[in-house]
Amino acid sequence: MQLTRCCFVFLVQGSLYLVICGQEDGPPGSEDPEHDDHEGQPRPRVPRKRGHISPKSRPLANSTLLGLLAPPGEVWGILGQPPNRPKQSPLPSTKVKKIFGWGDFYSNIKTVALNLLVTGKIVDHGNGTFSVHFRHNATGQGNISISLVPPSKAVEFHQEQQIFIEAKASKIFNCRMEWEKVERGRRTSLCTHDPAKICSRDHAQSSATWSCSQPFKIVCVYIAFYSTDYRLVQKVCPDYNYHSDTPYYPSG
């Protein structure tokens, strides 16, 4: 019987070491230790330095073996202790949103008497205030008016009432000038009516920044341009559904 037990142990040891770790010692008294000491030929023994595991660590070894044999989804069910992973809170989304960028809003007007380029940027700070930035580059003569209006403002020509309309529309917002810079000079270029001649025209370049508060969600830019040979009225509104988390429903 001792030879059969030794063969079984070596066979199992050669195939899987974890099975040996999970084996329990025989019950006390099953073999007589004094009888073994008096044997003439010593019995080959398995080294206990590698194979012996204390009773406290046996469940861990058995669980490791079960974990190798069980599907991945049942490993924590066998161990009985699900992992306590801390829930990661989602990162807070920033409230600052760019309504208009320098490349999103621009107006380029070219006439015989004027060459005008206006670019703008509007940034919503998410706390009821927003910043307005405009750049103006004009060569020639002409009158242009740039204002911030709600989406309900009609696009129409009222040259004789332009001053009244702009004064009324300016009360919709509470704005204050943050920064302004204006540069004026003269620029020479080929005449439009006769390219063989050189004409000198007025050149103006300005930049301005306002800080405003909005009583409504949508902020539109209203441009009105008047000259001797050209008139233009334009209203530009951002895509609110793209910049906002909630859809916009127009009213009024």
Curated annotation (Swiss-Prot):
Residues carrying a glycan: N62, N127, N137, N143
Tissue distribution: Brain. Detected in several other tissues.
Spans annotated as IV (linker domain): 158-166
InterPro entries: Nxph, NXPH/NXPE
Cellular location(s): Secreted
V (Cys-rich) as annotated region, ranges: 167-252
Skewed-composition ranges (Basic residues): 45-55
Keywords: Glycoprotein, Secreted, Signal
Region entry II, spans: 23-75
Chief place of localization: secreted
GO terms for MF: signaling receptor binding
Annotated signal peptide: 1-22
Superkingdom classification of source: Eukaryota
GO cellular-component term (any): extracellular region
Region (III): 76-157
Annotated spans, Disordered: 27-59
PTM note: May be proteolytically processed at the boundary between the N-terminal non-conserved and the central conserved domain in neuron-like cells.
One matching Pfam family: Neurexophilin
Similarity-based family: Belongs to the neurexophilin family.
Function description: May be signaling molecules that resemble neuropeptides. Ligand for alpha-neurexins.
Name by which UniProt lists this protein: Neurexophilin-3
